[in-house]
Each structure stands twice: as structure tokens, then as C-alpha cells.
Design a protein with these regions (language model features):
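Non-transmembrane, aqueous-exposed alpha-helical and coiled segments at domain scale
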Residues: 2, 65, 69-73, 91-98, ...
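Alpha-helical transmembrane segments
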Residues: 197-202
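Long hydrophobic alpha-helical segments that form multi-pass transmembrane helix bundles
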Residues: 116-189
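A generic, well-ordered mixed alpha/beta core segment in the N-terminal half of proteins
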Residues: 78-146
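Hydrophobic, membrane-inserted alpha-helices
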Residues: 28-35, 55, 59, 77-85, ...
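N-terminal signal-anchor module of multipass membrane proteins
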Residues: 1-63
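Structural signature of hydrophobic alpha-helical transmembrane segments
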Residues: 41-54, 91-99, 175-185
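A membrane-topology feature that recognizes alpha-helical transmembrane segments
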Residues: 26, 49-52, 56, 60-62, ...
Length: 202
């Protein structure tokens, strides 16, 4: 999905993007997003809502201040916000969800102004928060847990306690610690296959 967003990074005007493409991208994200909300609970769903709403609002305010048309940019912002939320751990404070949206939308607008995209603005926003708030951005919890029990990701398990290692089945279906929308290979593949069928990616 970040590879698809690299294509959006290269576009200097939203006139080159169709509504159908953005809608297809959002639809492709939904299976993994729903799974994240199911296994990590209502707060994960709230984080996804906050990042999406914040991205749309920030894009709207930017367009309003600089007198730009409120067109496809808002749909692009919705896709950006949803993907940002999926890249966050399910335990982050709500203000982190707002901050990552602010960084991403601001970076995106700067790239559009200079008509260059040297970096992926979504990845840049996430990396910035990992550097600034490493403890917050690397705190993962056990799925379906009512309490915030720390849990290792599959990659961390490889280098940690063998007893806590995630099984292949758990890793494939996403039943392990991780970011909200990044745990399940299966549900991400569903989205990827959908984009291939729609000929958005190849």
C-alpha cells in the first residue's frame, strides 16, 4: 500500500487521480482496518476515526486558508488518514493520532507546492513520531485483551524469548501484537488482490 502511495507522491496535481482510484484504495484498506478494530477493540477503531477525521479537517482548512478548491483532496486525505491510523499501535494517545495526521498533511502540501516528492509523506510522518516518541510508538498489546498487556511483534519475538514467539498461523491471520492495520498478512493480501483486480497496481 505504501508503494501505491509512492505513485501518489509523484503526482503534483490531484487532477491526475480519479475518484474511483481513491475509493478503490480506501476499500482495499478496509478489511485490515476492520480486523484491527476487532482484535484491538474500540480504542483502535477510535484511533482510525481520529486520524481519518483529522486528515480531512486539516486538508479542508489548508484549502480554505489558501483558497484552493475542496475537491479530490479531501478524499485523498481520507485515504491518508486511514492508512496513518493503521500504521499506529493501538495504545497511542489520541493527540498522537492528530499529530501524525498534521505532519503527513503538512508534508504532502509542501511536496505539492515544490512539485517534488523526495520522500513518502506517510512513512515520513510515522518515522518522525517513532524518533520523537519511541516509547509510545513501540508499545504493542495482546489482541482481545481487556488490559494493556505488553506483547511482542513477530519480528521482535524472533530476537526475544522463544516461548513468546508468534506462530505462523497467528502471523498470517494477524492474531498478535502490532500496529492496528499491519498485523494480518491475509487481510492485507485481500486488499492487494482487490487492487490488482481493479488494475490499480500490478
Amino acid at each position: 500500500f505504501l508503494n501505491f502511495y509512492n505513485k501518489l507522491n509523484e503526482i503534483t496535481t490531484l487532477k491526475d487521480i480519479s475518484i474511483e482510484t481513491l475509493v478503490d484504495f480506501i476499500v482495499a484498506l478496509i478489511p485490515a482496518a476492520i480486523l484491527g478494530a476487532v482484535i484491538f477493540g474500540w480504542y483502535a477503531a477510535l484511533i482510525l476515526t481520529i486520524t481519518t477525521a483529522a486528515a480531512i479537517l486539516l486538508e479542508f482548512l489548508w484549502n480554505l486558508i489558501f483558497k484552493k478548491p475542496q475537491t479530490l483532496g479531501l478524499l485523498s486525505a481520507a485515504a491518508t488518514g486511514l492508512l496513518l491510523g493503521m500504521c499506529l499501535p493501538p495504545t497511542v494517545p489520541f493527540w498522537v493520532a492528530i499529530l501524525i495526521s498534521f505532519i503527513a498533511i503538512l508534508t504532502k502540501q509542501i511536496f505539492l507546492l515544490i512539485k517534488q516528492a523526495p520522500l513518502n509523506y506517510i512513512a515520513l510522518a510515522r518515522v518522525a513520531l517513532v524518533i520523537i516518541f519511541p516509547a509510545i510508538m513501540t508499545k504493542f498489546v495482546t489482541p482481545f485483551s481487556l488490559d494493556a498487556i505488553s506483547a511482542a511483534t513477530p519480528l521482535a519475538s524472533i530476537y526475544g524469548d522463544a516461548a513468546s514467539a508468534t506462530t505462523v498461523k497467528e502471523a498470517f491471520f494477524g492474531i498478535h501484537g502490532g500496529c492496528i492495520g499491519e498485523t494480518s498478512v491475509f487481510f492485507l493480501l485481500i486488499g492487494g488482490v482487490y487492487l490488482i483486480i481493479k488494475r490499480i497496481i500490478d
